[in-house]
Amino acid sequence: MDEILERVRERVEEIRDRTFTPRAGGRSLRKALSGPGVSVIAEVKPTSPSQGRLRDVDAEDVAERARAYERGGAAGISVLTEPEFFDGRPEYVEVVREAVDVPVLRKDFIIDPVQVEESAHYGADAVLIIAAAVGREAPELIDLAHEHGMEVLLEIDRWEHLELLSECDPDVVGVNNRDLRTLEVDLNRTLELGPEVKDLTNAPLVAESGVSGPEDVVLLGEVADAVLVGTYLMRAPDPSEAVRKLVEAGRSTE
């Protein structure tokens, strides 16, 4: 992740002097994930650093895939916008927002206030803040996102991150099953950290990474309120049907 963050810092300086005009958000990801069973956040992710190129996309493809996810029953759409390692684009947030009616999450390595402003400019309803990337700066970025009318999914991936939950007020909490230091995936990370998160906050809990089918949704549903799924869906020949099967599995946990 160090290499990714180094490039992110360079891009931050490239956009620092730009003027961003916030767009009204208003679609609540927290509310969308608060229903019974396990909800599905479906992700548009052209490339994975661990899996390679998943699918060639342009703006039209991104919009159509987002619509397919929504038809399948996705509660929200995650848009990976990091350009160098994931082949995303910040503009894809706006593309997806105009294509669907469900909440849109901007997923990137947000480490600076200007990126929060950029997210609001493109119409994100929520932004991802990664504890491993920002540490004690998380509360400031979360407050700024709220000031711009956006919700925040705070991502943790280790025990020491639990302390942040007493220092800030995220709308949603995610547990990344991928260790960002080794890139290894272990679904037990959610099963172990999840109950501790539930003791500290009423925010919906999202299991991120590693979902490879409906059976994983059922397993993670022991503690999670939602799953965020990217690679599995990007490889699916019928993304709408793939989401539908995950949603059905989530409903079976009610």
From Swiss-Prot:
It comes from the Archaea. Its EC number is 4.1.1.48. InterPro entries: Aldolase_TIM (IPR013785), Indole-3-glycerol_P_synth (IPR045186), Indole-3-glycerol_P_synth_dom (IPR013798), Indole-3-GlycerolPSynthase_CS (IPR001468), RibuloseP-bd_barrel (IPR011060). SUPFAM superfamilies: Ribulose-phoshate binding barrel. The keyword Amino-acid biosynthesis applies. It catalyses: 1-(2-carboxyphenylamino)-1-deoxy-D-ribulose 5-phosphate + H(+) = (1S,2R)-1-C-(indol-3-yl)glycerol 3-phosphate + CO2 + H2O. It is an enzyme of class 4 (lyase). Keywords: Amino-acid biosynthesis, Aromatic amino acid biosynthesis, Decarboxylase, Lyase, Tryptophan biosynthesis. GO terms for molecular function: indole-3-glycerol-phosphate synthase activity; phosphoribosylanthranilate isomerase activity. Belongs to the TrpC family. This is Indole-3-glycerol phosphate synthase. It comes from Methanopyrus kandleri (strain AV19 / DSM 6324 / JCM 9639 / NBRC 100938). The gene is trpC.
